């Protein structure tokens, strides 16, 4: 089926789709661009957009109206009138209170480390599909990848900023200058985040080391950058040695849908030189450092034993134009399928979209979330069959 070809419509009716304004701290992304809304309205679906939802990407209310959307004064109006809610970040408590059993929620969720959110979604009865666990034919995570690329690149920008002495850092320039050594950048995890962090760091002239436990990943990184990167198989002793010597450590580990492993211990942080910088890109899934806790764009860093910690949970929200369009490029085919076919038929037809289903009908169907939070794992097929067409 072509990328924008209309799917068969089991529902026999077109869908009412809601686009609320994001309310997380300094979150300027939006779930649907005007171009994406245009694709939906051309198919006969109705889209209700909260006023100023797109202002962060330069999309005015008028731009949405021009492609067939209607504008609502507030979020309750959007939730009340919609069947499917399309967002970027996980719903905050005031948004979760507006979810109903007949809602489909399509957004990032990151439930494994978030017991409160999971409990509220279970209580709502809504069909909750997480971008970050949707898969593809290659075993990848296509809706997580765009933001992982952005976050990986931003991690080095953040590190360069907070290495500066006025910002609490040691006063080193990532690339050094002739006659002065560059900063040592240690990247834990060689996946999408890690590779894009490495690309930025190498481009700035940093001394880059990648640790991973997948030899194929290490081979790929070495083939890609050659002498520009050092690759090391990640063991506890190797990690201790590299972290102690690092000026910057990037936490780029990922376990699909699960909490991130705490690979950097308190003792490792204590071993680092004053003014070193930790950037925890895994903070959405609980963080890769024992000393991590989530921060915001308003107050992005804190110090532990004179080591700068940057752990902003929505890093790509600071570059909303780039990240919103990159995200929509990936999510639009799935959004169209859900709207055209209805959630039940779309989930039954597409195993990759089905892997994104985390909570439905008051039950948890994502194994990593059930394991992390102690929920009984419900049968996926039975819960999907119970969704209204």
What positions do the PLM features span?
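Glycine/serine-rich phosphate-binding loop and adjoining beta1-alpha1 elements at the start
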Residues: 3-9, 16, 22, 93-184, ...
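An N-terminal-biased, well-structured beta-alpha scaffold segment characteristic
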Residues: 4-5, 12-14, 19-120, 124
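General beta-strand structural signal in soluble alpha/beta enzymes
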Residues: 19, 48-51, 71-73, 79, ...
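Glycine-rich phosphate/diphosphate-binding loop of Rossmann-like nucleotide-binding domains
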Residues: 20-59, 166-251, 301
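Short glycine-/small-residue-rich Rossmann-like dinucleotide-binding loops
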Residues: 83, 89-90, 109-110, 235, ...
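Rossmann-like adenosine-cofactor binding region
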Residues: 223-305
């Amino acid at each position: 089926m072509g990328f924008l070809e209309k799917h068969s419509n089991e529902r026999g009716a077109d869908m009412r789709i809601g686009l609320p304004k994001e309310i997380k701290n300094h979150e300027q992304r939006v779930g649907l661009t005007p171009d994406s809304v245009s694709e939906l309205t051309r198919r006969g679906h109705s889209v209700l957009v909260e006023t100023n939802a797109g202002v962060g990407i330069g999309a005015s209310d008028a731009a949405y109206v021009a492609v067939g959307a209607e504008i609502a004064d507030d979020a309750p109006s959007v939730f009340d009138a919609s069947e499917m809610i399309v967002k970027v970040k996980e719903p905050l408590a005031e948004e979760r209170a507006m979810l109903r059993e007949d809602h489909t929620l399509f957004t990032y969720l990151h439930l494994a480390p978030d017991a409160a959110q999971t409990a509220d979604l279970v209580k709502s009865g809504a069909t909750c599909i997480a971008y970050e666990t949707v898969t593809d034919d290659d075993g990848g995570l296509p809706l997580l990848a765009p933001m992982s690329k952005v976050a990986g690149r931003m991690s080095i920008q953040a590190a360069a900023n907070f290495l500066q002495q006025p910002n609490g850092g040691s006063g080193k320039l990532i690339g050094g200058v002739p006659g002065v050594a560059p900063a040592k950048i240690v990247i834990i995890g060689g996946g999408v985040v890690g590779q894009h962090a490495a690309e930025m760091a190498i481009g700035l002239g940093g001394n880059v080391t990648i640790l991973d436990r997948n030899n194929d990943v290490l081979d790929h990184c070495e083939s890609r950058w050659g002498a520009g990167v050092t690759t090391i198989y990640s063991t506890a002793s190797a990690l201790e040695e590299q972290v102690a010597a690092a000026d910057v450590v990037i936490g780029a580990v990922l376990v699909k849908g699960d909490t991130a492993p705490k690979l950097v211990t308190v003792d490792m942080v204590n071993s680092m030189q004053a003014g070193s910088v930790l950037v925890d890109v895994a903070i959405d899934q609980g963080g890769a450092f024992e000393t991590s806790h989530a921060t915001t764009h308003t107050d992005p860093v804190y110090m532990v034993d004179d080591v700068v910690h940057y752990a902003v949970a929505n890093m790509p929200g600071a570059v909303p134009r780039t990240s919103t369009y990159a995200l929509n490029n990936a999510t639009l085919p799935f959004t169209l399928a859900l709207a055209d076919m209805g959630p039940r038929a779309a989930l039954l037809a597409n195993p990759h979209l089905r892997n994104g289903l985390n909570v439905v009908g008051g039950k948890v169907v994502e194994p990593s979330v059930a394991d992390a939070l102690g929920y009984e794992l419900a049968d996926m097929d039975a819960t999907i069959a119970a969704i209204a067409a």
